[in-house]
């Protein structure tokens, strides 16, 4: 039997790992465009990894639907700053060695790319780790920057699909929510084609537009939600 469901029932985790210099140029903005399309249909996007929006949090705070929502996000950043200071660390200890090999230079550069996964719509809610996401639209969930831990929280919060952009490459997959992998560059996509669902590098190598790639990602969300397996599931 076939059961029809609305796109508004989708809650999508917006995740990245193994970022490179093209993450903020191709895959992440394209995912942000797809998130906007999803939100327009009544669906929900859930951004996470609080330490990895450090330095770009103002771009999200000014999109908050009200002062209370913006202040909740500020509170999360303040907590992580205090936590790292108490443990003799700092919030600017990113990017990782792999990020640097991929061309990222500072946490600010990395954060600008990470934040772009959230598109352009208002920030409707800010939630604790694994707290049920009760708002519709673009939301944020507190989590560490470690991908498996972050995605686990997003799934526990209610995400029934996971989108995962990567530039350096990643073998990450998830259950019970399917994971759609998006490559930032064509070289890596061709090398890991058996594990990548979408090549956002085609925006550079084939001249595809942001809108075209964003629509492709959105269509893939619907395809996988309809039962077709992603590469991580195959």
Question: What is the role of each PLM region?
Answer:
Residues 9, 14, 20-234:
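Anaerobic metallocofactor- and corrinoid-dependent redox/one-carbon enzyme cores
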Residues 2-3:
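Short, small-residue-biased leader/transition segments that mark boundaries at the very start
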């Amino acid at each position: 039997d076939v059961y029809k469901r609305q796109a508004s029932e989708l809650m999508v985790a917006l995740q990245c790992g193994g970022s490179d210099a093209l993450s903020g140029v191709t895959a992440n903005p394209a995912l942000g465009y797809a998130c906007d399309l999803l939100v327009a249909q009544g669906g929900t996007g859930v951004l996470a990894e609080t330490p990895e929006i450090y330095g770009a949090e103002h771009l999200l705070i000014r999109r908050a639907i009200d002062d209370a929502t913006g202040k909740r996000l500020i509170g999360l950043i303040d907590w992580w700053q205090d936590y790292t200071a108490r443990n003799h660390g700092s919030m600017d200890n990113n990017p990782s060695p792999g990020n640097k090999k991929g061309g990222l230079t500072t946490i600010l550069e990395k954060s600008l790319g990470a934040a772009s996964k959230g598109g352009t719509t208002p920030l409707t809610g800010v939630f604790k780790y694994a707290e049920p996401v009760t708002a519709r639209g673009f939301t944020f969930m507190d989590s560490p920057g470690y991908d498996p831990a972050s995605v686990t929280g997003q799934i526990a919060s209610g995400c029934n699909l996971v989108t995962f952009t990567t530039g350096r490459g990643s073998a990450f997959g998830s259950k019970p929510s399917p994971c759609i992998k998006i490559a930032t560059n064509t070289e890596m996509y061709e090398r890991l084609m058996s594990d990548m669902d979408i090549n956002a590098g085609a925006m550079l190598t084939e001249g595809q537009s942001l809108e075209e790639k964003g629509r492709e990602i959105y269509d893939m969300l619907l395809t996988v939600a309809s039962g077709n397996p992603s590469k991580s599931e195959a």
